[in-house]
Regions:
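Hydrophobic beta-strand-centered segment that forms part of the acyl-chain substrate-binding groove
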Residues: 52-58, 62-109
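Short secondary-structure boundary micro-motifs
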Residues: 5-7, 24, 38-40, 71-78, ...
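Catalytic strand-loop segment that frames the active site of acyl-thioester-processing enzymes
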Residues: 1-58, 147
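Short, charged/polar low-complexity linear motifs in solvent-exposed/disordered segments
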Residues: 36-37, 49, 82-83, 120-122, ...
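Short, intrinsically disordered/low-complexity patches at protein termini
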Residues: 41-43, 82, 87-88, 121, ...
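HotDog/MaoC-like acyl-thioester-processing domains
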Residues: 3-13, 91-150
Length: 150
């Protein structure tokens, strides 16, 4: 992934980006869950084994936070940062201790703003994938992206 700063005008439908990786540990899962999603199957190995997950699983919100980190640190370097305007998220399967995640993203839509000519709306589809090639999260995000000065 190039570290070139990208403006709305630089992007094309079909452009793709791949991030670096992030390894998830059991301690990470429990630490995040203790603060933000304190459900037994995220906090306790025994409770997790007896849950529908059959073992310790990261909160979906933890997976989403990892995805955001990977996009910000290794995804497309957007001129104004990653400014979200909504989207849809689906968790396809649990993120487990030891998973090594990366994100693959594709530009699926670009719409110049009619009312604010200094920006446009980017629809970016990002799949968070583990070391086995399995999609653990699917995110379609609408992002506000700055245009180049006229």
């Amino acid at each position: 992934m190039s570290q070139e700063t990208l403006y709305f005008d630089d992007l094309k439908v079909g452009d793709s980006f791949t991030t670096g990786t992030y390894e998830v540990s059991a301690a990470d899962i429990k630490r995040f869950a203790a603060e933000f999603d304190p459900q037994p199957f995220h906090l306790d190995d025994e409770a997790a084994r007896n849950s529908m997950f059959g073992g310790l699983a990261a909160s979906g919100w933890h997976t989403a936070a990892i995805t955001m980190r990977l996009l910000v640190t290794g995804g497309p370097k957007l001129a104004n940062g990653v400014l979200g305007a909504g989207g849809e998220i689906a968790w396809k399967m649990p993120t487990r201790p030891g998973d090594v995640l990366h994100v693959e993203s594709e530009v699926v839509e670009l719409t110049p703003s009619r009312s604010r000519t200094d920006r446009g709306m980017l629809v970016l589809r990002s799949r968070t994938i583990n070391q086995h090639g399995e999609v653990v999260q699917d995110l379609t995000a609408r992002l506000v992206v700055a245009r180049r000065s006229a």
